[in-house]
């Protein structure tokens, strides 16, 4: 009931004890933009100033009249909940005033593309204090600047995003806002967790659909297509990242996205694919056989090793734990398993770990934050050490497997959502390069090369850190449940 100021409850379906409730008030599902703005201001540690954010503009491809697919800037979305192009936003910290600016009405654009948001529609839809048209933006900022005191700053993310017309004496700060927003985004609120959970729900449906049909498929492209079809059919139009559907040796390529090779003669598929829901990501990886069971003992053994790595790490997730310690644990388990298989040799587990030899087979980090980005931001990277200025996600840089001291690494906090994604890979390139490195004496290359047809195994879930431990938000089948679905698919 629009504008009623209360939530009307409609019982839309009753099935035994399953009662699904729909809340019809607009306020119930509004993105908590105002709460986020206050959180960012608290991280800034100031009592006055103006935050100014620029949304994603409409942009054409180079040398083309065709627009690029729209993707909202995530920092802008965090303070607005607006997934529309060509918008702006200000937040007056002292007066606690969040203002959204929407595009001016353009008749030509409306005829061709449909009308843009009106002020009234935006005010009803979004959790902001006021909505104005873009034409008001310059004058509003000039008025704020005219009233500001000498200690107030205008906060922007990047120097390239400053307003066009400002008094020369107004001080700009393009350094403080980004880390403040990163710190705020690292801890998810209830609304954000619901979005990530829903993204995982749709992803699980798509992963299950692939398992049900994989034995009737001929190419990696069919796997990608069915995953996309299932997500879109269930309301998730966008993927959080490019789908990785690598079969055979392609499964050893961490970010393989060509997805254009035949499945025939391949043992395993590594499917790393996650839907996006209302701009929030899921990140899910499953590795499965192209048969009703594991095609070889080697494939089974590597899957079970990665399964053990993941289970042992997930069970230890709770607030106060250093994620880097879990990454070291994953390497220890990997080394022990690879020694049992005769792939690693000639030293103790600790000697091999300190040498870095295990990174040939487990070359990426154990995980990363998930949120508005699949590799989401936070106050500090999960595996960062004191003095480490590396910005990128831990999955994109070499793993710290033999770090001498982990005490400066950040601790897990309640409200964080992190992936746990161990993997074991047998890459021809990595093995060839390892022969030239100092730890080559620990690797039985003849034995390792027998595993190259497997490619690699990765298993990845999204884990919420809770007050009492953790919750696995990912429900995509794995292990024996996964195999049973593949087997049932033969008869369907």
Curated annotation (Swiss-Prot):
Enzyme Commission no: 3.4.11.9
Cofactor names: Mn(2+)
Keyword Metal-binding included in the entry's annotation: yes
Gene Ontology MF term list: manganese ion binding; metalloaminopeptidase activity
Residues involved in Mn(2+) 2 binding: 272, 283, 460
Keyword Hydrolase found: yes
Any one Gene Ontology BP term: proteolysis
Cofactor binding description: Binds 2 manganese ions per subunit.
Pfam families named in the record: AMP_N, Peptidase_M24
Assigned keywords, A-Z: Aminopeptidase, Hydrolase, Manganese, Metal-binding, Metalloprotease, Protease
Binding site for Mn(2+) 1: 283, 421, 460
Catalysed reactions listed for this entry: Release of any N-terminal amino acid, including proline, that is linked to proline, even from a dipeptide or tripeptide
InterPro entries per UniProt: Aminopep_P_N, Creatin/AminoP/Spt16_N, Creatinase/aminopeptidase-like, Pept_M24, Peptidase_M24B_aminopep-P_CS, X-Pro_dipept-like
Biological role: Catalyzes the removal of a penultimate prolyl residue from the N-termini of peptides.
PANTHER family membership: XAA-PRO AMINOPEPTIDASE 3 (PTHR43226), XAA-PRO AMINOPEPTIDASE AN0832-RELATED (PTHR43226:SF3)
Family of the protein in this entry: Belongs to the peptidase M24B family.
Protein name, entry field: Probable Xaa-Pro aminopeptidase NFIA_010500
Species assigned in the record: Neosartorya fischeri (strain ATCC 1020 / DSM 3700 / CBS 544.65 / FGSC A1164 / JCM 1740 / NRRL 181 / WB 181)
